[in-house]
Amino acid sequence: MEGSTSPKALRVAAISGSLRRGSANTGLIRAAKEICEESIPGMVIDHVDIPDLPLLNTDMEVDDGFPPAVEAFRASVRAADCFLFASPEYNYSISGPLKNALDWGSRPPNCWADRAAAIVSASGGSGGSRSMYHIRQVGVFLDIHFINKPEVFIKAHQPPKKFDSDGNLIDPEIKEELKDMLLSLQAFALRLQGKPANSKHAA
């Protein structure tokens, strides 16, 4: 229709808690990006890198400003409509790099507040479930609103093979689970924004 405009795409800031080359968690973000491009209209994944963030030190906050890498990171968080965290599990908890990113984003003014988020995890043992629940606990204080279901935690080292040697997701069933989670995140994020979500996941 003449004069009509397309709805603004929902932008998802996706953060991997692993800095390792070939990380399966970073591979999950790549897979999520591909899924959105191929089959979820109106949703765009922006991979936000965190390797350059310094360890949190409030002495670095000078004249109400932050180091350049932190400023750039916080700008990416502020620009997002919602978040996707891909988290490994280290020693039953959150990885250091991801906790550091959460902490930098929380410095006043809190960049995380009042937006939807989802967590996906690939790890050994329980598949990262303990890490996921610790992120949810941190998110309570940060006013992040996590979707409750579906939960996607992947026992990365159990057969059948789920990732290739570069960390790319190759399991079609997990890709479907990831798509279902992204649709749920999209619906919940739109609800928080007061917009209609034409999806079975909106309920």
From Swiss-Prot:
Keyword Secreted: no
Listed cofactors: FMN
Keyword Oxidoreductase among UniProt keywords: yes
EC number(s) on file: 1.6.5.2
GO cellular component: cytosol
Reaction catalyzed: a quinone + NADH + H(+) = a quinol + NAD(+); a quinone + NADPH + H(+) = a quinol + NADP(+)
InterPro entries for this protein: Flavoprotein-like_sf, FMN_Rdtase-like_dom, NAD(P)H-dep_reductase
Keywords: Flavoprotein, FMN, NAD, NADP, Oxidoreductase
GO molecular function terms noted in the UniProt entry: FMN binding; NADH:ubiquinone reductase (non-electrogenic) activity; NADPH dehydrogenase (quinone) activity
Function of the molecule: The enzyme apparently serves as a quinone reductase in connection with conjugation reactions of hydroquinones involved in detoxification pathways.
Subunit structure: Homotetramer.
Family: Belongs to the SsuE family.
Name of protein: Probable NADPH:quinone oxidoreductase 2
